[in-house]
Amino acid sequence: MVVFSKVTAAVFGLATIASAAPAPPTRKGFTVQQQARPAQKKQVNLPAMYAHALTKFGGSVPESVKVAASKGSAVTTPEAGDVEYLTPVNVGGTVMNLDFDTGSADLWVFSGELPASETSGHSVYKPGRTASKLPGGSWQISYGDGSSASGDVYKDTVVVGGVTAHGQAVEAAAQISSQFLQDKNNDGLLGLAFSSLNTVQPQPQTTFFDTVKSSLDRPLFAVTLKHNAPGSFDFGYIDHSKYTGEIAYTDVDNSQGFWSFTADGYSIGGGQSSGSSISGIADTGTTLLLLDDNVVSDFYQHVEGAQNSDEYGGYVFPCSAKVPSFTTIIGGYKAVTPGKLINYGPVTDGSSTCYGGIQSSGGVGQNIFGDIFLKSQFVVFDSEGPRLGFAAQA
């Protein structure tokens, strides 16, 4: 999530981040599989989702998007067959379904500090005998779409895929806005960005990955997200059965705490490469693919009937339109995002107008390679370097 405040604690003149301890012994690695959760018949406000993605990284929200979000002009209900994919995590003895988010560095959860009316349907974290409250510790997040959450911080035992982190910072929500209450299946978030991005005050805390990576065979994790199927997160090793060809690696700039990289160019529908570099963040916590205005405009010139709609707060097009693929060029590798993923779905129930999965990155200042991009890729997040690796999914 967005950096709300970066707090640095100096010890002997060096910036530090409070760390937890993994449980011995060293092991090669582990896999956590997402689980399908039946989708509730809930409405999705598409412009609000877009605004949330922009403000997550400190960007400004265009007025047309704000108006569309407030009017609910593009509100749709997922189809009955849709499913949601979350990952089970044992937090202090309670199994919770969390979003794994490479665009943030906080582990925050619904907790018993919230009113009972706000936790109905959720697994709730209640600090027990393994927990200790972090003295003076607090956290707070807020977004331009009005959503916010805040609370206290505990050190507790967290288990993911059989690997245990003792003394892991757990951010217990004591206040949460209505936007976060709509998804009854999701009990919180586990951040996988760099620990420098952690928002705990007065001292940032380490992420789960940074806590356990010394116990892994290799200090990396690999992400395989799927379209309409559960994905997986592999920690400590690379599963060669999950990709084809060679993995193309590129350097990461983590100066802002994100998995930021630069692609060499792009092409549309298999056409000629633009040759224009694209810098952006690999973010499993953002649904859309957010790109520079000129790239987005170029793409939708290839979609018949596409327009940047003030009414719907983004690019829309006839649902019957043929949507080309979008190819991101990384070294000698071509990462292809199929057109079927870019057609996000009808703007409202039963509408013949569809919302685009590629939208403008606006005032963010960099591009966001969200799930629309990631669901066709096998991606290695390697903390040594650091670097990112990309290959086509098997």
Curated annotation (Swiss-Prot):
Question: What is the top EC class of this enzyme, as a single word?
Answer: hydrolase
- Point out the coiled-coil segments of this chain: none
Residue stretches making up the Peptidase A1 domain = 85-391
SUPFAM superfamilies listed in its UniProt record = Acid proteases
**GO molecular function terms attached to this record:** aspartic-type endopeptidase activity
One Pfam family name from the record? Answer: Asp
Location within or outside the cell: Secreted
UniProt keyword list: Aspartyl protease, Disulfide bond, Hydrolase, Protease, Secreted, Signal, Zymogen
Please give the biological process terms from Gene Ontology that the record holds: proteolysis
Catalysed reactions, semicolon-separated? Hydrolysis of proteins with broad specificity. Generally favors hydrophobic residues in P1 and P1', but also accepts Lys in P1, which leads to activation of trypsinogen. Does not clot milk
Instruction: Determine if Glycoprotein is one of this entry's keywords.
Output: no
- Spell out the PROSITE patterns in the cross-references: ASP_PROTEASE (PS00141), PEPTIDASE_A1 (PS51767)
Q: What is its EC number?
A: 3.4.23.18
Give the active-site positions: 101, 283
Specify the domain of life of the species encoding this protein. Eukaryota
GO cellular-component term (any): extracellular region
Positions of the propeptide removed during maturation: 21-69
According to the record's subunit comment, the protein's assembly and interactions are: Monomer.
Role: Secreted aspartic endopeptidase that allows assimilation of proteinaceous substrates. The scissile peptide bond is attacked by a nucleophilic water molecule activated by two aspartic residues in the active site. Shows a broad primary substrate specificity. Favors hydrophobic residues at the P1 and P1' positions, but also accepts a lysine residue in the P1 position, leading to the activation of trypsinogen and chymotrypsinogen A.
The family database entries (PANTHER family) matched by this protein are listed as:
ASPERGILLOPEPSIN-1-RELATED (PTHR47966:SF2), BETA-SITE APP-CLEAVING ENZYME, ISOFORM A-RELATED (PTHR47966)
Q: Which family does it belong to?
A: Belongs to the peptidase A1 family.
**What protein name is recorded for this chain?**
Aspergillopepsin-1
| Organism from which the protein derives | Aspergillus clavatus (strain ATCC 1007 / CBS 513.65 / DSM 816 / NCTC 3887 / NRRL 1 / QM 1276 / 107)
Write the lineage as a comma-separated list.
Eukaryota, Fungi, Dikarya, Ascomycota, Pezizomycotina
